Amino acid sequence: MAQEKKQRVNEEISAPEVRLVGEDGEPLGIVSLNAALNAAEEAGLDLVEIAPMAQPPVCRVMDFGKFKYQEQKKAHEARLKQKQVQIKEVKLRPATDENDYQIKLRNLKRFLEEGDKCKVTLRFRGREMAHQEFGLRQLERVKADLEEIGQVEQMPKMEGRQMIMVISPKKNR
């Protein structure tokens, strides 16, 4: 997990005077640390250092437990909203039949519509290596069929006995 920034609370604050902000966000001016601590204690709340680098440091009167809980909740919601982009792989062969090709194409379309990247792998066996143009033609066909919903991120290239192309979803949808 990420290192969370630690706010100093109550007696942990070391500055002789602070810029005090009330619990409703209203500025109460620059006061001594003791006066600020007394104001927080009278309200039954904590004195929390919000901006330690300011001159003088900005401190706010608030319920620190509630503040930490709200921060955790915000961080959790932000994590939930992030979309993990996954790379889905579809494997083809130079001699893939039409029906199989259509099924794989439908899967590729579904992956792209869900916002995932797709890695199209075309595997060569035996003597097929001598006729790589068939494989290239197959990948060009995939590229043409997915033109309206995807864009080629990595052009077809050979890696060992397979040709690989990466397609990502189009942004302007």
Swiss-Prot record:
Q: According to the UniProt entry, where is the signal peptide?
A: none
Name where it's found: Cytoplasm
- GO biological process, alphabetically ordered: ribosome disassembly
Q: Which GO MF terms does the UniProt record name?
A: ribosome binding; translation initiation factor activity
Recorded hits in Gene3D superfamilies, A to Z, give: Translation initiation factor 3 (IF-3), C-terminal domain (3.30.110.10), Translation initiation factor 3 (IF-3), N-terminal domain (3.10.20.80)
Q: Which UniProt keywords apply?
A: Cytoplasm, Initiation factor, Protein biosynthesis
Q: Which Pfam families match?
A: IF3_C (PF00707), IF3_N (PF05198)
- Main function: IF-3 binds to the 30S ribosomal subunit and shifts the equilibrium between 70S ribosomes and their 50S and 30S subunits in favor of the free subunits, thus enhancing the availability of 30S subunits on which protein synthesis initiation begins.
Q: Please name the NCBIfam families in this protein's record.
A: infC (TIGR00168)
The entry's family comment says: Belongs to the IF-3 family.
HAMAP family, alphabetized:
IF_3
Subunit relationships: Monomer.
Q: Mind telling me what this protein is named?
A: Translation initiation factor IF-3
Query: From what organism does this protein derive?
Result: Aromatoleum aromaticum (strain DSM 19018 / LMG 30748 / EbN1) (Azoarcus sp. (strain EbN1))
